């Protein structure tokens, strides 16, 4: 008695092929499938196999046999296709454990041409065939064959062929591959059709148009127990991408002092015109203090740089490289560099001047005007009209000495009002008396002497 995967009652023999003397159906060759498809064409709608090896001529090898199950596709290079002992045989209703033996066959898929003209080879897809069927129907279990991986249930006898009929795509659709609980899927591979509702819906729509018998088979397929092996492709691919980028998918990356210092140093190592200020490297560290020659940026924008929420709308006004070079006035100026003890090198400045013109029809015009008015010459507004050039912080010892000096200056000390008063206060010599008498006789009062001092 031959078993038919997906059917609870496997007692009926399949008529999809002629039976040989040993009770095993003959192989259904690629030519047989092509002829059958051509004969069915005059019925109005040609039956197409579902989830089978490719039937189109391509640069890869053509698989002339239809697997009972959907394939397993490789999506990550460098990974080996393998299962642990006793695992890897797809489960299907109607197949006893003793018949769960066979092999996975690697199908090398076609290559395609990329937009830049290069040929790229698609990663292979693997299909399962029961022992004694498929491309290597005559092989003995365990034979070393390139592109073949043998699997069997622990209760199966691998010395005899599996009594399983080969699939006729016009009568049986491929069964979505499912494994027994505890099966570990090879890393870097995913099951075709796993976790998707589209194949089920398409199967349902086809079963409605094919009559009650096919609907019964379709419903029996849907009653298969769900496998614990359900790889979520979205999570796997996201994890691979994050790992490639050096990020942890589990936790958000925290910015430490060390990482912020590294980011800041990386920015400052770039040429001045290539720097992008942000929270880790503020505007003034990148481009210096605000003043007449660098007059844009309020206090908040100076801290955040391009991370400021208002900056993106300003970036819409920034010229493109083409507009910068072809729409500006440029002048190349040679500058002196270094001191007497430094090596001489030629330094040039590409000085430019230009204008960016826009009008009230520009999207976000009012917001742009508001942000510009808040940040243009903001250094003057915040300092009451005085240029903001922050003095260098004084050291503690120098500041204490300055405070002590101020205290001494605050002490009141009597001081003479003029040098003449200081001269009057001292004792006069005979020469001074003679000179003073002569001046008084002439009636001339020297500066600084008045009646109160006489």
From Swiss-Prot:
It is found in: Virion; Host endoplasmic reticulum-Golgi intermediate compartment; Host Golgi apparatus. ADP-ribosylated. The ADP-ribosylation is retained in the virion during infection. Phosphorylated on serine and threonine residues. GO terms for cellular component: host cell endoplasmic reticulum-Golgi intermediate compartment; host cell Golgi apparatus; ribonucleoprotein complex; viral nucleocapsid. Keywords: ADP-ribosylation, Host Golgi apparatus, Phosphoprotein, Ribonucleoprotein, RNA-binding, Transcription, Transcription regulation, Viral nucleoprotein, Virion. Residues 260-383 form the CoV N CTD domain. Residues 1-62, 186-230, 271-292, 385-428 are annotated as: Disordered. Packages the positive strand viral genome RNA into a helical ribonucleocapsid (RNP) and plays a fundamental role during virion assembly through its interactions with the viral genome and membrane protein M. Plays an important role in enhancing the efficiency of subgenomic viral RNA transcription as well as viral replication. The modification Phosphothreonine is found at residues 177, 429. The modification Phosphoserine is found at residues 170, 194, 390, 425. The gene is N. Residues 64-193 form the CoV N NTD domain. Its main location: virion. It comes from Rat coronavirus (strain NJ). This is Nucleoprotein. Residues 49-61 have a biased composition (Polar residues). Residues 267-384 are annotated as: Dimerization. RNA binds at residues 109, 125, 167. It comes from the Viruses. Residues 11-21, 193-227 have a biased composition (Low complexity). Belongs to the betacoronavirus nucleocapsid protein family.
